[in-house]
Design a protein with these regions (language model features):
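Extreme N-terminal, non-catalytic leader segments
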Residues: 1-22
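Hydrophobic anchor at the beta1->P-loop junction of P-loop NTPases
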Residues: 24-26
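Conserved lysine of the Walker
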Residues: 34
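Conserved nucleotide-sensing/catalytic segment adjacent to the nucleotide-binding pocket
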Residues: 48-109
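Conserved nucleotide-binding/hydrolysis micro-motifs of P-loop NTPases
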Residues: 58-61, 86-89, 129-136, 184-188
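A glycine- and Lys/Arg-enriched "phosphate-lid" helix/loop adjacent to the NTP-binding pocket
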Residues: 95-106, 120-167
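NTP-dependent small-molecule kinase module
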Residues: 167-205
Length: 205
């Protein structure tokens, strides 16, 4: 019931208030719950009011013009976009897997703040936080479940071996602008994120 109350509240905010474009960035480790969170948060929203961007491994041409690529995927006025991973992939997943060069990585660290400010949109950022033990348990459930085994890939097991390194990488970019949400209990995490999102939207100028 509490979740439905917050879902209805988000719908009301987006329907009844004029606003600049809103970016809702969801970052987190593999299995943290980014996709399922977006499904829950958007469940009752008017499809004309929002869109979802799923980030996958980028092409070489996209890698070379990383921030320019994302500039074309910003929300319009009175629109909200949910990002299942985002431009911050450069500093985390890409860096972790060696997909970007040292120069590309350092360039992102130097420019991403000013780039965000230049977009003319509100950016609300969430880190979905899970422990190493919880990530391991979720990967095992994914691997063994007849409903989710198809999602399992070698990247999932690699994620466990890179847990500490990912922690270091995310700490280089996650600052006071971010909302860190405990996702060890995913259902409670979704509620906390949605409640935080609604409060943040209500306080936007």
């Amino acid at each position: 019931m509490k979740l439905k109350t917050e879902q209805a509240k988000l719908n009301s905010i987006l329907e009844n208030r004029a606003h600049r474009g809103i970016c809702v960035v969801l970052e987190g480790r593999d299995t943290a719950g980014k996709s399922s969170t977006i499904r829950e948060v958007t469940h009752y929203l008017n499809p004309q009011k929002y869109s979802v961007h799923l980030s996958r491994k980028p092409s070489r041409s996209t890698m070379k013009k990383w921030l320019a690529y994302w500039s074309k995927r910003m929300p319009a006025v009175n629109q909200i976009v949910f990002y299942d991973r985002s431009w911050y992939s450069r500093a985390m997943v890409q860096r972790l897997n060696g997909w970007c060069s040292e120069r590309q990585y350092q360039n992102f660290l130097a420019k991403h703040k000013s780039w965000e400010q230049s977009q003319g949109v509100h950016v609300i950022k969430f880190w979905l936080s899970i422990s190493e033990d919880e990530q391991r348990a979720r990967i095992e459930r994914r691997k063994k479940s007849p409903l989710t085994y198809w999602k399992f890939s070698p990247n999932d097991e690699n994620a466990l071996s890179y847990y500490d390194r990912m922690t270091l990488l995310k700490e280089r970019v996650i600052d006071s602008d971010w909302h860190i949400i405990d996702y060890n209990d995913k259902r409670q995490g979704i509620y906390s994120l949605l409640e935080t999102l609604n409060t943040t939207l209500e306080n936007l100028e």
